Amino acid sequence: MSGTILENLSGRKLSILVSSLMLCQVACFLMGGLYAPVPAGHQTVVGIKCRDVPGRQNDTNFFLYSRGNGACKSLQDMDIEQDPLKMANQLVYVFQMPLPRDNRTLDYSRWQQNLIGVLQVDIAYDSSSELREPPKELQLTIDTRLAYRNKKDADTDWKLYAHSVEQRYLDCHAAHVGLLETLYTCDIIPLFELGALHHNFYLLNLRFPIDTPKRMNLQFGHMHDLTLTAIHQNGGFTQVWLLLKTLLFPFVVGIMIWFWRRVHILQRSPALLEYMLLYLGGALSFLNLPLEYLTLSIEMPYMLLLSDVRQGIFYAMLLSFWLVFAGEHMLIQDTPNKSTIRSRYWKHLSAVVVGCISLFVFDICERGVQLRNPFYSIWTTPLGAKVAMSFIVLAGVSAAIYFLFLCFMVWKVFKDIGDKRTSLPSMSQARRLHYEGLIYRFKFLMLATLLCAGLTVAGFIMGQMAEGHWKWNEDIEIQLTSAFLTGVYGMWNIYIFALIILYAPSHKQWPTMRHSDETTQSNENIVASAASEEIEFSNLPSDSNPSEISSLTSFTRKVAFD
């Protein structure tokens, strides 16, 4: 048995490898901090009030727009206030995106990937009316129409993208109390989400139909102002992100091929940990595959859902690997049989399975439906919000249980190592130094695993944070959010790259010896190596299971049984 590269690699070569990987990690942080802008940008668009054209309310191919030839005439607030019915069923709120800047017409780029719209509603109640304040759960019915056009199209050539009649529930509070009316400001509500930003210009028309028999929009007084916040991924961040993926993808695929070839050279079946390393590398390669380049030429509204699925597969595989990685280094096994996922780890992985299924169901309920209707949101109804929150809480509880259990397993491994180190003084000096070196390397790798796990949890939280926590200061030279995201992404690749290298079978072959000559010959080899400039922590021949890949585990189990 030749052991792993972690056990056989010399101290100098291991230092060079670790230093190189650390430099790559620093480069990933600097790439995001110095060259990438914030991951998401936004633009605030105030709704332009236009008078609807009679007879065209039900024509989904008719659009009112505020800029360009044939633009609608904006209505003044005074005109609306003087109307006894506040121009009910006559108003259309127009949002044309993106807004011009410095008298220049701006357009969206396909590098910006996606577009999310949230709506701020301000409503007013007349002091003379019977209804003077909104109810607790105010239901608002909105006729939403989203259109698009491209640079080469005429100003009037708007095409329908999506149409839907949606209900939203408002939670409002008084902002200004006047003699004639009271103004209420409502919490932001989600309006739409586009998984692909394929066109240059977008147009949104909102109508608030009032229908007495259906009791539609009878309780919200009259609309005062509407403000749309359009959130998009920054094109500069997308370019840096795809550059990082493009650079990392071939390295991970190449190291996987190299690793599997070394495993197949051995005269044994692959161990469970070797299978898990291969699966983990495959999940990372699937995540690294820069499919986003296709969105530059093809409209792919399902890219957000696909990205979530890819990241979910990677998270599930990474979390499962950490449990198996710690479990396979337990020094006293419950059963002497070969480890399998089903026999030893189904209880350990139950929290991972529950959490991943919860997030997957939530994602399908949200973004899966948005492929047909971008205005849909599971958060719009009280029941839907409770169901969505229950899925998120369930996933969060599973994540907390998982992390605590992982820390317990690592602590148990360290405790077992400490207990078994009491047998080291009875060994020869060369053999004791050999195993002390292995224990030191393994502890360092375990601590790196815990650090990676902690940063992964932090990165997941930052990725799920609402982009309402936007950085409004545009003068920050180093964007911590971008640096953290690219740094964590690079850390995943570097960590898995290092694991695949260090746990690959070593090419060093040691001669087969009789048991009586084992200790003498091994000590002579190690002492001879120790006298050289670089000490090789070679694997000592033993009668352990030939499927073992770690001589540290083999040693401690042998000591325990002895």
UniProtKB/Swiss-Prot annotation:
Single Gene Ontology MF annotation: Wnt-protein binding
Keyword annotations: Cell membrane, Cell projection, Developmental protein, Endoplasmic reticulum, Endosome, Glycoprotein, Golgi apparatus, Membrane, Postsynaptic cell membrane, Segmentation polarity protein, Synapse, Transmembrane, Transmembrane helix, Wnt signaling pathway
Listed InterPro entries: WLS-like_TM, WLS_GOLD, Wntless
Pfam families, per database record: WLS-like_TM, WLS_GOLD
Membrane topology listed for this record: Multi-pass membrane protein
Ribosomal protein found in the keyword field: no
Lumenal side: 35-239, 292-311, 366-390, 463-482
GO cellular component entries: cell projection; early endosome; endoplasmic reticulum membrane; endosome membrane; extracellular exosome; Golgi membrane; multivesicular body; neuromuscular junction
Principal place of residence: membrane
UniProt subcellular location: Presynaptic cell membrane; Postsynaptic cell membrane; Cell membrane; Endoplasmic reticulum membrane
Biological process per Gene Ontology, one example term: regulation of intracellular protein transport
Keyword Cell membrane appears in the UniProt entry: yes
Annotated signal sequence range: none
Membrane topology, Cytoplasmic segments: 1-13, 261-270, 333-344, 412-441, 504-562
TM annotation in the entry: 14-34, 240-260, 271-291, 312-332, 345-365, 391-411, 442-462, 483-503
Glycosylation sites recorded in the entry for this protein: 58, 103
Similarity comment: family membership: Belongs to the wntless family.
Purpose of the protein: A segment polarity gene required for wingless (wg)-dependent patterning processes, acting in both wg-sending cells and wg-target cells. In non-neuronal cells wls directs wg secretion. The wls traffic loop encompasses the Golgi, the cell surface, an endocytic compartment and a retrograde route leading back to the Golgi, and involves clathrin-mediated endocytosis and the retromer complex (a conserved protein complex consisting of Vps35 and Vps26). In neuronal cells (the larval motorneuron NMJ), the wg signal moves across the synapse via the release of wls-containing exosome-like vesicles.
Assembly behavior: Interacts with wg; in the Golgi. Interacts with Vps35, a component of the retromer complex; wls stability is regulated by Vps35.
Protein name (database record): Protein wntless
Organism: Drosophila virilis
Gene behind this protein: wls
